[in-house]
Amino acid sequence: MRITNYYYLLKGWEGNIAIYQYMDLDYLLSLLESKQYFVNRKCHFEDKGESVLPPKSLFGLNSIGVQLNKDEITKMTQKLSEKLNRYRESASWLTSCWTKDNTESLLMWKNYTTKIGVRIKSKIENVIASINTDKYKIVCGHISYDGYNSKPFEECLFSKERYYKDEYEVRFYFIQKDESINSLSGEFIAVTPETMIDEVILSPYINKNAAKIISQLLREEYSLQTVKLSKIELR
C-alpha cells in the first residue's frame, strides 16, 4: 500500500483513474442538496462473503496431507482465528463501491438503480479530495475475482468470488478513527459534490423528454456542466 496523510491506495493504483457509480436520481439530488454522501456498511451487502469468510478460504492446497506437530497446529489455529475475527470485525466498515468500467452496463443500470437512475463519473483522487472530514482512514483498491483462498486478511478485503467479475469494482473503505463507535447503520459523510462529480449520465429508462428536463435542472440548479443522456437505445 502507498500511505499518505490519511488514505491508503493499494500498490499499482494511481489516483487519476476514472471510476463510476450508479445510483437513483433522488439519491444524487439529496447528495447535491445536503452535501452528504451516504455510505453503507458491508455487513448489509447481499454477498455473504462480505461478512464471513467461507471455510474453504482458510486452507490452501499445500495444507492437505501435510503432517504438523502440536506447536505448528496451535500456531496455525491461532492465525486462522485471528484472520476470521478481523474479517468479521471488518463487516462493520463503511464501504463505497464503484466500477472502473467506462462502458455503460444495462446490467448495472438494472441492479443498482430504479427507472429514474444516474451514473456519476469521478476519479479516485477526486473522491478522496471531496471528503470534508478527518474522522476516517480511507483505504482504496480494486477487487480481484479469484476468491479468498489462502489469502492474508488485507487481500481478502479486496477479493470476491468470480461470479461478480463483471462489476470491475473499485472499493473505498472508510474506517472510523474513533474505535469506540459501534454502529451497524450506514453514515452520511460530508463531501464537496462539485469535487466528487465530473460527469452525470442519465438512465436509458428515463423518458427522453423527462431526461432533457432533468439535465437542464442539474446544469442550472447544481452547476453540473457535463450531463449526458444514455447511449443505450431501448424501446
Predicted regions and their residues:
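Partner-binding and oligomerization surfaces adjacent to conserved cores of proteins
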Residues: 1-235
